[in-house]
Design a protein with these regions (language model features):
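Bacterial N-terminal signal peptides that target proteins for export
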Residues: 1-9
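Bacterial N-terminal signal peptides
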Residues: 8-19
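Boundary at the C-terminal end of the N-terminal hydrophobic targeting segment
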Residues: 19, 25-27
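Active-site histidine-anchored catalytic micro-motif
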Residues: 30-43, 47-79, 118-216, 222
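Conformational coupling and interaction surfaces
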Residues: 31-34, 51-59, 63, 195-198, ...
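Metal-dependent C-N hydrolase catalytic cores
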Residues: 33-34, 39, 75-136, 302-310, ...
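Short, mixed-charge aromatic SLiMs
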Residues: 74-80, 175-179, 283-297
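Short, well-ordered secondary-structure micro-motifs
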Residues: 106-108, 180-183, 227-229
Length: 326
């Protein structure tokens, strides 16, 4: 990229960022006691998990008390997190690994995970770690689930009473009215089985029946494309965090990422970015997330708060102001 091009990109993005009254990224005051959160992630396949983690790390409203890996090669995912956290100066955040399983996807960022000397010799069990933290902080922890719900289903099976002591669960998952490729313009795409739900349907069914306050960020509100101009601006910042994101992005090997997962973090910090409404959602045996209003005279009680729409410009102003800040 030429110097003049880089300058032009910076001017364009800066104009974009200051075009909103919430562009400083600090739309909600930092509380005296930050929100305790655990992030459950399948980082290392798609790239959006890393972008979600970056936003969480740049949100002073959140206290990350641990990160758990889920789905497939959970140990390599944990090693990736070890390196990422060490390189950005946050090695103290605990990382726990879920039960390993035969991988169903290619770990696109494996070389990053296996590089350097950052991996810890052992990672605690994710389900045991999650339940231990809930017992330690009953009613205080928000669980952010941005991968298949393997650990969540196992935790419910092991100790449902303790699991119900979570403050809330926020998931990226489901497809209510819009499917993959439906960005709110162009030909509509019908609802589809969404990846995180589809890859552990029984665990998703258990979560929606668990009785824990549940907030759902489905495909309807999370198909957020990080275009070339915004990527160039973000990756040119030269901070340890943006440098790590840049390296993971290039190992991912595709061009334009869709930032599904970061909306879970953005919603917790600034709920106005993804307004929710109460719904009763049924997970069928094919992985569809079906809203069930019930008959008019006997409506079904809601089991989730669901976001069906978001404003991409507002989201990216919020995201870039946080993650691109030195």
């Amino acid at each position: 990229m030429s110097k003049s091009t880089a300058v032009l990109i910076s001017i364009v993005v800066c104009a974009f960022l200051i075009a909103s009254p919430t562009s400083n990224g600090q739309s909600s005051p930092t509380p005296a006691f930050p929100e305790k959160v655990i992030l459950d992630t399948d980082i290392g396949d798609d790239i959006d998990d890393a972008f979600a983690l970056a936003l969480a790390l740049r949100s002073p409203e959140l206290q990350i008390i641990g990160i758990t890996t889920t789905f497939g090669d959970t140990e390599t995912r944990a090693k990736l997190l070890d390196r990422f956290l060490a390189e950005i100066g946050r090695p103290e955040i605990p990382v726990a690994a879920g039960a390993p399983a035969p991988p169903k996807t290619t770990l696109t960022q494996r070389r990053y995970a296996e590089g350097g000397h950052f991996a810890k010799p052992v990672h605690p069990d994710a389900v045991a770690f999650l339940l231990e933290q809930i017992r330690r902080y009953p009613g205080q922890i928000t669980l952010m689930a941005i991968g298949p719900l393997v650990n969540i289903g196992a935790a419910i099976d092991k100790d449902p009473a303790t699991f119900r002591k979570l403050k809330r669960v926020i998931i990226m998952g489901g497809s209510i009215k819009r499917g993959y490729g439906d960005f709110g313009f162009g030909p509509p795409m019908p609802p589809q089985p969404e990846w995180n739900i589809l890859n552990d349907i029984p665990s998703a069914q258990k979560l929606f029946a668990a009785g824990v306050p549940l907030f759902v960020m489905p495909l309807d509100a999370t198909q957020l494309k990080l275009d070339e101009v915004k990527r160039a601006f973000l990756f040119s910042q030269g901070t340890p965090l943006t440098d790590a994101l840049t390296l993971l992005y290039h190992q991912w090997g595709q061009e334009t990422p869709t930032l599904f997962d970061p909306m879970t973090i953005a919603f917790l910090v600034n709920p106005s970015l993804c307004p929710v409404q109460p719904m009763h959602i049924r997970i069928d045996d094919k992985g569809f997330t079906r809203p069930e209003p019930g008959p008019p005279d006997t409506p079904i009680a809601p089991n989730a708060q669901v976001c069906l729409d978001s404003n991409p410009d507002s989201f990216f102003r919020f995201y870039l102001n946080r993650v691109a800040t030195p």
